[in-house]
Amino acid sequence: MKTRIHLAAPLLALSLATATAAWAQATSKPPEQLGIVSFANSCAPAVQASLQRAVALLHSFWFGESEKTFREVLEGDPACAIATWGIATNIIGNTFSEGPLLARAKQAQEIIERGRAIGAKTERERYFIEAVGEYYDRYGDRTPQQRMKSLSNAFEVVAKRFPDDDETKIFSAVYLTATQSLDDKTFASALKAAAILEIQFKKHPDHPGVAHYLIHSYDYPPIAAKGLNAARRYAEIAPSAPHALHMPSHIFTRVGAWQDSARSNERSAAVAQAAKDPGGGLHASDYMAYAYLQLARDRDARRLVEEAQGIRAAPTAPRGMHYSLAAIPARYAVERGAWQDAAQLKPRESRVLYTIAITHFARALGAARSDDPAAAESDVQELARIAEALKAAKNTYWSTEVEVQRLGAAAWVAYAKGNRDEALKLMRASAELETKSEKSTVSPGRLVPAYELLGDMLMENGKPGEALAAYEQSQVQDPNRYRSLYGAGQAAAQSGNRDKARYYFSRLIDMAGSGDPRHETEAARRYLAGN
């Protein structure tokens, strides 16, 4: 059986370049640029172009289009069992998210059973179908982390069983990265996957999945710079895929390259809009808004807020859509220090509790920092309720993230009430808890880093030296943030450290000096002019 796979591969695993040309000729559409894949299979020659396209789309997380194409393959060749693997894999959605709703998972289980009934023609195809089946086994009884671990373990077996098949290695690597715990500061799983993918990148420099998954493997601040090569290549490899245009900004955001991030997401959002992919467009818009606000491009960020206000996410919409719709307006208020605006934000209805928490966190900060702690207290209580609900649902990561928010919000409420020692104690607890894990890949960054908030509080408490240390600590994790740079410059100036003040204010002007007017930018200019 193994020999048959290797003999079949040159005949049946077409390169995407050939497949795309055939597909474009058949549809009279301009050729897509999705990269080059060569996926061995035993399906009919008539469906090869579509099958290779479906795999390439999957590698670029274009799930709706990929699933549709795999279904067309199965319709064109009812004996093509591997197409059922593709459909079930697309239903998982973003490998780094929490998986589909139960109703969709049941659809995947049904299509897997169909694949088993069809009967895989090769051992490799049977392994692929059974591997994705491991993800859906006892679906409702397991956590997302447990399901992904099962999928990763299954594909590790597949990769070992077929050591000469690079596609198995590539899929195995992305699933391994997806098991990376956000509180593991060694990044062991992600770096192990990256080592596999770096070898594949040399062999397959135009493969969309390799570049894409390398970015995910390095999407953590301490190792993000290692992903710059893949980030710069991926958009060139698959410019027709919205996610390929967006994904480089994960690395650009981690290293604080805001102009690059903004450009990536402008392109991604445009392609997503043309492709009628609202989820991809919103995810790009959240990253875009984050970048704009660091560059003080406030009018551009405001446009994204207005666009988001006109969108309603269905209850069954991907979690990322719910996240972006909550995050964009909250970022716009908080990043600009528009505290009264933040206090007036309205929580959206959502099944995704941690996205509702974003709005309550922004509201609490806004009210407390507008000297209205009484108004903030109900939002702090709501954050506590959400954290407990997530904990009860065994969603430990997001429960902890919301607890970080609750502590930070409670700190500012205490500060507004005049309980400054208690406030600083709570704010330090928030910052220390936040450092124990990384931000989620659904987000360009937390709404505001806890160490940055600690710096703000220390400044208001007349402790600029301690504030400077807090702002600098914040920049270790989140470099080149506007508010951290300004805060560090201000803290350095007030503590008599002229060199550091000039350093941070100069960086702020270089980064955001051509943006929209902000009083912080003008204050930095005045300091530099006089010092």
Where are these regions (language model features)?
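Residue at a conserved register position within TPR or TPR-like alpha-solenoid repeats
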Residues: 57, 91, 134, 176, ...
